[in-house]
């Protein structure tokens, strides 16, 4: 669940909503890229027409008996808001983008996540060999770690000759891959803990930057003039600029993103007034519902999204919902809260009944994002990149999704060079935050499980996008 604040879109003829609800960012972004835009001047988007959402499905409200925040229209809670419709093919963004210096492979490739090292004589929960650490959410040896990574990366399919009844040990692990992989999953190893292709690029970028930095230091030690390095940096900054098509793409993304504003009355309510744990939970549920609505509308407006297979659209939206909401919450936490209110908000959320084991890493993530001093353009692009991740489950045409994501990565990489030329690792750091975001999918699933046990209620929209029965 997104635990910071709701985000709402301005009402349109196609998407009628309560006047006091929609839009997310209260202030305009600084600089020329954040100014109000006249999209009529951008030819690739002149003819874009966004389809109407299907008629809303009426449902009984969970909140009709509560008076501590305004009651919203019944259709606000409806799963009908989640329905995505196709857009005519001719309205697809056709702008050509400059080829990025960062290579992008045709198919997503995964890599191992960093594992926590351990001490002592702990044994691998899969085969009984000596464990080397926690790999992909389970205590395993290096052998089972590598086997699981290779199996998931290659989408391997094994078949047991003994009907799937092999007892896994250090001997049998080499004889039956089917039972070994099954045991890995039973012991809690998670495919989603493998790094995505984007995060692999981030690791490579970090490594390359470090090697370049070491080389620069060596040259300086041999008597190179430091002023030459400064001159080179300035020259690089002068040459780095967006192409016309990239600027058009960025303007379009920012226009969709900047239509969002954070309703101050709801945030102020949770900051200024103390409620019971149950009331806090209901407020947070309403905030999450609002975030999902904004996510749906922003996603529908991503260039090329509605040309994808309809099932792929659903898979992308459901797969990215948690990560996109936490990223949006990080922006609100770091840029939109009144001064000195961050600690107060954390205190109030801890009183909502949610376990500290989920809240602590969440706020640690918010603070780590704040340290990067991200611009609004970077938040918008990173959100779009998260949504258009080709390695989500159930995606049928991954290459088509990747083609939509690549131009966004190119623009983000250039913006990092423009805004922070003195920090060549900034782009890699932004992508590295996606690794942290992936862990929230697992935490969120555990939270939902605990809430179902406690019989907490969700709006139909949240039930649909979170697959809550």
Curated annotation (Swiss-Prot):
Q: State whether it acts alone or in a complex, and with which partners, per the record.
A: Heterodimer with RXRA; the heterodimerization enhances the binding affinity for LXXLL motifs from coactivators. Binds DNA predominantly as a heterodimer with RXRA. After activation by agonist binding interacts with coactivators. Interacts with NCOA1, NCOA2, PPARGC1A, CARM1, SETD7, PRMT1, GPS2, SMARCA4 and MED1, EP300 and SMARCD1. Interacts with XRCC5 and XRCC6; decreasing NR1H4/FXR transactivation activity towards ABCB11/BSEP. Interacts with PAGR1 AND NCOA6; indicative for an association with an MLL2/MLL3 complex (ASCOM).
Q: Where is this cross-link: Glycyl lysine isopeptide (Lys-Gly) (interchain with G-Cter in SUMO1)?
A: 119, 272
* Family recorded in the similarity comment: Belongs to the nuclear hormone receptor family. NR1 subfamily.
Q: Which residues of this UniProt protein bind chenodeoxycholate? A: 328, 358, 366, 444
Q: Which organism is it from?
A: Rattus norvegicus
Q: What induces it?
A: Heterodimer of NR1H4 and RXR activated by farnesol.
**Residues recorded with modification Phosphothreonine:** 439
Subcellular location as annotated: Nucleus
Chain ranges of the NR LBD domain: 245-469
* Pfam families, A to Z: Hormone_recep (PF00104), zf-C4 (PF00105)
Q: Which sequence positions fall in the DNA-binding region?
A: 121-196
Function of the protein: Ligand-activated transcription factor. Receptor for bile acids (BAs) such as chenodeoxycholic acid (CDCA), lithocholic acid, deoxycholic acid (DCA) and allocholic acid (ACA). Plays a essential role in BA homeostasis through the regulation of genes involved in BA synthesis, conjugation and enterohepatic circulation. Also regulates lipid and glucose homeostasis and is involved innate immune response.
Instruction: Give GO MF terms, alphabetically.
Output: bile acid binding; bile acid nuclear receptor activity; chenodeoxycholic acid binding; DNA binding; DNA-binding transcription activator activity, RNA polymerase II-specific; DNA-binding transcription factor activity; DNA-binding transcription factor activity, RNA polymerase II-specific; nuclear receptor activity
Lineage of the source organism?
Eukaryota, Metazoa, Chordata, Craniata, Vertebrata
Q: Which domain of life is it from?
A: Eukaryota
Per the record, the GO terms for biological process are:
bile acid and bile salt transport; bile acid metabolic process; cell differentiation; cell-cell junction assembly; cellular response to bile acid; cellular response to fatty acid; cellular response to lipopolysaccharide; cellular response to xenobiotic stimulus
Q: What is this protein called?
A: Bile acid receptor
Entry PTM: Acetylated by EP300. Lys-210 as is the major acetylation site for EP300; the dynamicly regulated acetylation inhibits heterodimerization with RXRA and transactivation activity. Deacetylated by SIRT1.
Write down which residues bear the modification named Phosphoserine.
Answer: 132, 151
């Amino acid at each position: 669940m997104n635990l910071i604040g709701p985000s709402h879109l301005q009402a349109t003829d196609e998407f009628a909503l309560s006047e006091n609800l929609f839009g997310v960012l209260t202030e305009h972004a600084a600089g020329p890229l954040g100014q109000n835009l006249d999209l009529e001047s951008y030819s690739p988007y002149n003819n874009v027409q966004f389809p109407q959402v299907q008629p809303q499905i009426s449902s009984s409200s969970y909140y009709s008996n509560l008076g501590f925040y305004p009651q919203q229209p019944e259709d606000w809670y409806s799963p009908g808001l989640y329905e995505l419709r196709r857009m005519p093919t001719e309205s697809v963004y056709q702008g050509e983008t400059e080829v990025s210096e960062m290579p992008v492979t045709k198919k997503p490739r995964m890599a191992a996540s960093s594992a926590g090292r351990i001490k002592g004589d702990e044994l691998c929960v899969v085969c009984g060999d000596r464990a080397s650490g926690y790999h992909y959410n389970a205590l395993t040896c290096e052998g089972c770690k590598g086997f699981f990574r290779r199996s998931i990366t290659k989408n391997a399919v094994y078949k047991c000759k003994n009907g799937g009844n092999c007892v896994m040990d250090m001997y049998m692990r080499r004889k039956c891959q089917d039972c070994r992989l099954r045991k890995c999953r039973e012991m809690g190893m998670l495919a989603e803990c493998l790094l995505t292709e984007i995060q692999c690029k981030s690791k490579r970028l970090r490594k390359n930057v470090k090697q370049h930095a070491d080389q620069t230091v060596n040259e300086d030690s041999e008597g190179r003039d430091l002023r030459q390095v400064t001159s080179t940096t300035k020259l690089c900054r002068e040459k780095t600029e967006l192409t016309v098509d990239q600027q058009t793409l960025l303007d379009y993304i920012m226009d969709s993103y900047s239509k969002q504003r954070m309703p101050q009355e709801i945030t102020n309510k949770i900051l200024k007034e103390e409620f019971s744990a149950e009331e806090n939970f209901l407020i947070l549920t309403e905030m999450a519902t609002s975030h999902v609505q904004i996510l749906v509308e922003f996603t529908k407006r991503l260039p090329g999204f509605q040309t994808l297979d309809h099932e792929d659209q659903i898979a992308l939206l459901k797969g990215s919902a948690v990560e996109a909401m936490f990223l949006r919450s990080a922006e609100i936490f770091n840029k939109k809260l009144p001064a000195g209110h961050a600690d107060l908000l954390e205190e109030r959320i801890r009183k909502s009944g949610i376990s500290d084991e989920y809240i602590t890493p969440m706020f640690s993530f918010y603070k780590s994002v704040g340290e990067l001093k991200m611009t609004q353009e970077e938040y918008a692009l990173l959100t779009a990149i998260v949504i258009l991740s080709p390695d989500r489950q159930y995606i049928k045409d991954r290459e088509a999704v990747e083609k939509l994501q690549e131009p966004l990565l190119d623009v983000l990489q250039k913006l990092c060079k423009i805004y922070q030329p003195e920090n060549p690792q900034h782009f890699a750091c932004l992508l590295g935050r996606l690794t942290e975001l992936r862990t929230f999918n697992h935490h969120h699933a555990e939270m939902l499980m605990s809430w179902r046990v406690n019989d907490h209620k969700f709006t139909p929209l949240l039930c649909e996008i979170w697959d809550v029965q």
